[in-house]
UniProtKB/Swiss-Prot annotation:
Task of the protein: Acts as an anti-FlhC(2)FlhD(4) factor by binding to FlhD, decreasing its ability to bind DNA, and thus negatively regulates expression of flagellar class II operons, decreasing motility in nutrient-poor medium. Required for resistance to host phagocyte oxidase.
Chain ranges of the EAL domain: 1-237
Gene: ydiV
Name the record gives this protein: Anti-FlhC(2)FlhD(4) factor YdiV
Subunit structure: Interacts with FlhD in the FlhC(2)FlhD(4) heterohexamer, inhibiting its ability to activate transcription.
UniProt record similarity statement: Belongs to the YdiV family.
Organism field: Salmonella typhi
Keywords: Repressor, Transcription, Transcription regulation, Virulence
Transmembrane segments: none
Length: 237
């Protein structure tokens, strides 16, 4: 996809691994970076997303689905989950555009990721769009702890999975209370979702600290994103 910002940028898609406590692959998040046409500048999606039009956000989501389609046998063969972040601006389109809905719903391993800044998230199941999304797709709250939402939507049972925010984890990791605080979160949240995951695992030392705490999966710089050409290497370790 080509995005028109101060200059033209094109999207490049990568797979961000999610591992279990034994460092075995359980799923992949499809993420995007944006590169200038001359390749001299690269920006992550979170910096570019606020400047994308609704049409550009739609095109990027479709581009991710197309990549997922080319890799679907890999996901099925290795029993992996695929996560795609859904921008709020196109959440209604996913439900109302029959072609887009069909493309997404055909993958049994596909789950929709949303962030804490999703409009009306604190309304929980009273948010009609969010409730409808949860009826049709497994949802994951991708950055719990970012500080932009309450726990209502989690306790309403809208999310199959919850991922703790990487910045939240890295800030807490510096505190002596990190382990008991994580135990408290696991105890509080686990009964309201199928899987509680943790991001911000950038080192072996951090992985060793987090692995015994009761989380089902881990994500971070310890397992960097890979292009589609290197997917097979993730299951050969």
């Amino acid at each position: 996809m080509i995005a028109s910002l101060d200059e033209l940028y094109h999207s490049e898609l990568f797979f961000l691994p999610v591992m279990d406590e034994n460092a075995r692959l359980v799923g992949l998040e499809i993420i995007a970076t944006f590169a200038a046409e001359d390749g001299a500048v690269r920006m992550p999606t979170e910096l570019v997303a606020p400047r994308l039009s609704v049409e550009e956000q739609y095109c990027l989501f479709v581009e991710k689905l197309a990549l997922l389609e080319t890799c679907q046998h890999f996901f099925i063969q290795h029993k992996l989950i695929a996560w795609l972040n859904l921008p709020p601006a196109i959440s209604d389109l996913l439900l109302l555009d029959s072609e887009l809905f069909s493309r997404a719903a055909r993958f049994p391993f596909f789950e929709v990721a949303i962030n804490e800044n999703y409009p009306g998230l604190n309304q929980g199941k009273n948010n009609e769009t969010l409730a409808n999304l949860a009826m049709h797709f497994p949802l994951i709250l991708a950055n719990f702890g970012a500080g932009e939402a309450s726990t209502k939507a989690i306790f309403d049972g809208l999310f199959k999975r919850v991922m703790l925010d990487k910045n939240f984890i890295q800030q807490r990791a510096e505190m002596i209370s990190f382990e008991p605080f994580m135990h408290a979160i696991v105890a509080q949240i686990s009964s309201s979702c199928e899987s509680l995951m943790i991001a911000g695992i950038d080192t072996e030392a951090m992985f060793a600290r987090a692995a015994p705490l009761g989380f089902s999966a881990f994500q971070g710089g310890l397992w960097p994103p890979v292009p589609v050409s290197q997917l097979i290497k993730l299951v050969q370790r």
